């Protein structure tokens, strides 16, 4: 079959994928980040652009500006399409850019081989659940995905037009590269990629009689492109370069589930991103990659492109993963998947081409189609949560549940909120319906039309019992994995469960009693006996009520009932054996019963599992101080600086350590300043390192 036929097939596939994307985008909810700060940030950045930099309210934002220019553009477009809610416009534009990214990747595949390869690329990317799903709502990463794909395409055009590159290709390369870099500085890899592609082109043509002239032309184009890229990036970002780059460092890390443990996003294992990418890319892509690697050496074709694309992906993942300030969110690397899909498509096309009969050619075409059936089914069956996907190698969602994150974006809040709107009956206060969510702003968005009837309460899962609410909406994230695996999950007061593939991703709870809430109230007023009675009833009604059990431990501690205290500690640790608060009370219990070695061991385990649980540091330092192990007491309290949790309480404990040694308080200050300057310097925070170094020298000179 000729190229004209394959081009028609490609166009049909492209139209079909675009139609599916735009028909489904309206059903997706917004992420918690979009509700909490992205829209506000977008409006501020839009004002900055329209005022030519005079409106600087955007500079007050402490959040990273992933795809800032794109988010600002969505504000302008929402003004144009004012009949539509801003989130609808934003998501539609994101879907458009998702399709544009897929299209450019397919066109790049065509440049590498043919229209059939482009069709394979379009199918693989278009029906990849993660790429498709994130194109529906993820305005942080899809614009990077699209512009990076376009940059790769124009870099290939520059190399293909050897020995006389076209100015128009250089212009579009510079434009798309600058947009990609301004959206995510990690994608600056594209500049090195372009250089690699062009060098390969030059080496491949080393016998060409115009090689020297071509090298000069490409060098001029490279210098000019870099200048244009730098200029556009400077225009697009509201801060200076160093401040802008610093804004992408994690300023508010959160805990996510990985390999059955909760990790802080800036303290994940180095292989986290690689493993997550491997687990969420369809198995068909890896089959195609293996075919490409094998057949490129047998057929001696496309070796340069395949090796280059693999190097691009590997470099992107490694550079991002090895950064000391990485946020650990693997979705920021969606752009790095593009070359892998193209390599896979090349592999499948090589397989078809190497087939000698019509039947084997049809079989070769059928292989990727059959392998992509399950991912495609996932997109429709799990709509509108297709982005929650784990491939066949991992055992799917059922295996990932309780081991890896599923719903950390919070898009299921939309469906859960609608259930409460349609079915909410029980009213605790008699006036307003109280709804608890992980994000107050997200809750206010979904219940906006009912702001006089519904009041939003923000709470985490483990603290839900300490707040007043009639209904609670909890996406399954930030919950101890042991609770997820227990026989008590979902809780018996669950009135609605949002599930995909029979795996719960969001719960709607209805409060069936208020024993835990009033029990905590009695405890706050030091009415311990009434508090214990109500709290025990609360745990009877919900055996996984963490807050009620913690309050029971506290209540029995107040009346020095050590046996009851130990009973509730054991009950709590039975359902959440690695919980930091429960283990902290266990360490405290061991200490007051004279088992200091066990108290020390437990405290160290808490710190190892959750390095940001400050109470464990305070407690361990106190134990060391009482044992006159002053160096260890000082070191453990100073180590809180490494995790940015050194506060007034830590400072007071450091002073106690020095007072116990009858040393001057100024020496404690010096010790803190010296440690802080070294800690910040080690972590690349040069300004803070200089600040504390200066404070150290000033304090020392005063002595």
Language-model features: locations:
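Loop-to-helix entry region of an early transmembrane alpha helix in multi-pass inner-membrane enzymes
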Residues: 64, 68, 72, 80-100, ...
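C-terminal luminal/periplasmic domains and tails of membrane-associated envelope-modifying transferases
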Residues: 399-703
